[in-house]
Amino acid sequence: MSRILGLDIGLKRIGVAVSDPFGVTATPLEFILNDEKVFEKINDLIKNYKISKIVIGLPLTLKGEEGEQARYTKEFVENLKNHIPQDIEIIFVDERFTSSLAEKTLLQTKKKNKKEKIDSLSAVFILQTYLDRLSFSNEATNYSY
């Protein structure tokens, strides 16, 4: 079974999460440095986890508009498409508030390196949002009359 990869694109680091094989839960992975080897590392994840889709957080403004970071994310995705298999579907998910949710969650723990963990935890929230929507839409289809 294939899995879904969740990414939170940042200028320095990329938060990473992966779904379970059934597409129910998202689990954080170690962040990736956004450097010259970033596409190679993402390709390794695609191969190792048998990824069929990538869900990427799109950082919209509070008004729902695309700002500078959203434009950077879209540009990153255009470059990513040139480095991954063409059959991998890429989906954007509104990521407003995921970083603040991740920060609040980590404040309740005593983990070290919180800054690095926020990136992958944000990726978990991004991916889990997508998985929950997918599950809800499947349930609605299965229970329609």
UniProtKB/Swiss-Prot annotation:
This is Putative pre-16S rRNA nuclease. It is an enzyme of class 3 (hydrolase). The keyword Iron does not apply. Disulfide bonds: none annotated. InterPro entries: RNaseH-like_sf (IPR012337), YqgF (IPR005227), YqgF/RNaseH-like_dom (IPR006641), YqgF/RNaseH-like_dom_sf (IPR037027). Keywords: Cytoplasm, Hydrolase, Nuclease, Ribosome biogenesis. Gene3D superfamilies: YqgF/RNase H-like domain. GO terms for molecular function: nuclease activity. It comes from Sulfurihydrogenibium sp. (strain YO3AOP1). Its EC number is 3.1.-.-. One of its GO terms (cellular component) is cytosol. Belongs to the YqgF nuclease family. The keyword Transmembrane helix does not apply. Could be a nuclease involved in processing of the 5'-end of pre-16S rRNA. It is found in: Cytoplasm. NCBIfam families: RNAse_H_YqgF. One of its GO terms (biological process) is rRNA 5'-end processing. Pfam families: RuvX (PF03652).
